Structures are given as structure tokens and as C-alpha cells.
Amino acid sequence: MQAKLIEILESSQIRLYPQFQPGDNVRVYFKIQEGNKTRIQIFEGLVIKFKKNGLSSNFVVRKISHNVGVERTFLLHSPLVDKVEVIRSNKVRRAKLYYMKKRSGKSARLKEIKRKELKNL
């Protein structure tokens, strides 16, 4: 009984996003609060981890900013995540791309794949 009730409550909070996976370059529009103002900040980078766990699904995006690697974890169904855009899809053979942290320059390139129209999750 309680499991069904929790499932019903969680299903009302799940949001639809385009389908993406580790290895994809994404642009995340994230709401941040500065004082009493709210603005949208864009974080663009490579998805190195994606964990599907119902309402607490999360993903990690990594980018290089001023020659320093920056990683940020986002909750997929958070109300602070405004939208997620897939910029390009890359061919990878792993679920977690932690090895990309050590790479730079040409060794950090990934092979791009063409995908059909992206479907919602």
C-alpha cells in the first residue's frame, strides 16, 4: 500500500527530458538564486555519469573552464533544472567515463554518431 502511494506521488513529479546517455555533449539550463533574483545559468559539457534511480536520477556533466576541469552533478527531475539540450552524441563503450578526466587534447576526442530524432524518456 505504501509503495503504491509513494509511486503515485513520485510519478507526479517526474519531468520529461530528451533521451541522453554518457558520452553525449549536453547544455543544462539551471536556475540559480542570487539574493532575491532568479536567473538561468547554462552549463555545457560531456555527460560522464548517468544514474537512473526513479525520482532521484542524477547525471554528472564535465567541462574544461580556463584549463581546469569542472564537474557538476544535477538531479534529473529537480525543479531547478529548467531544460536539457543534447548538442551531439558520441560513441562510447562504457557507462561511466571517469577515464576522460585524465585525458586532454586529441586523446579526449570521441567519435560522433548520428542519432534519429531524440525521444523523450
Curated annotation (Swiss-Prot):
It holds the Pfam family Ribosomal_L19. One of its GO terms (cellular component) is cytosolic large ribosomal subunit. GO terms for molecular function: structural constituent of ribosome. It comes from the Bacteria. PANTHER family: LARGE RIBOSOMAL SUBUNIT PROTEIN BL19M (PTHR15680:SF9), RIBOSOMAL PROTEIN L19 (PTHR15680). This protein is located at the 30S-50S ribosomal subunit interface and may play a role in the structure and function of the aminoacyl-tRNA binding site. This is Large ribosomal subunit protein bL19. It comes from Mesomycoplasma hyopneumoniae (strain 7448). The gene is rplS.
